[in-house]
Amino acid sequence: MQSQCQPAPRQALTDAVIAAKARKRLSFEDINQGTGLSLAYTTAALLGQHALPEAAARLVAERLELDEDAIALLQAIPLRGSIPGGVPTDPTIYRFYEMVQIYGTTLKALVHEQFGDGIISAINFKLDIRKVEDPDGGHRAVITLDGKYLPTKPF
């Protein structure tokens, strides 16, 4: 298992993935089928935020017509965090920052794929957090972010 220390190779692969996805007119769901992984995980991996298991890397590479080097890179542990900027210092807020660093591009891609060009409102918005028992012991936080979709309007 390899780990990346520079973001450039994975960013170049992400660019190739997005180009192939568009050229072949595939959705992330199409690409994910048969991987045995969640749609969000595979999408995050294709956007450079996770490593894929070998079988999944080979399957998505075949769908996207990527080469052996790309298959190897899809399996490498990425240098995570795709959103530059200042880092919060409060530990709880930092964890949300970390979540957005890892899944922000995935959320953006899936929102645009499912809704079109636009945003999820943080004004017309509902947030819910629930504490639930974790079957493995302890507790889990279930956080629901419920925002109205607002399409971009040409002017």
Curated annotation (Swiss-Prot):
Q: Which UniProt keywords apply?
A: Lyase
Q: Which reaction does it catalyse?
A: cyanate + hydrogencarbonate + 3 H(+) = NH4(+) + 2 CO2
UniProt EC number: 4.2.1.104
InterPro entries, per the entry: Cyanase, Cyanate_lyase_C, Cyanate_lyase_C_sf, CYNS_N, Lambda_DNA-bd_dom_sf
Q: Does the keyword GTP-binding apply?
A: no
Entry-linked Gene3D superfamilies: Cyanate lyase, C-terminal domain, lambda repressor-like DNA-binding domains
Q: Which cystines does this chain contain?
A: none
Record-annotated membrane-spanning stretches: none
> In the UniProt entry, which residues are flagged as the active site?
95, 98, 121
Gene Ontology BP annotations: cyanate metabolic process
One MF annotation (Gene Ontology) recorded for this entry: cyanate hydratase activity
Which Pfam family is one of those matched by this entry?
Answer: CYNS_N
Q: What does this protein do?
A: Catalyzes the reaction of cyanate with bicarbonate to produce ammonia and carbon dioxide.
Task: Report the sequence similarity comment from the record.
Answer: Belongs to the cyanase family.
Name of this protein: Cyanate hydratase
Which organism was this protein described from?
Chromobacterium violaceum (strain ATCC 12472 / DSM 30191 / JCM 1249 / CCUG 213 / NBRC 12614 / NCIMB 9131 / NCTC 9757 / MK)
Traced from the root, the source organism's taxonomic lineage reads: Bacteria, Pseudomonadati, Pseudomonadota, Betaproteobacteria, Neisseriales
Tell me the name of the encoding gene: cynS
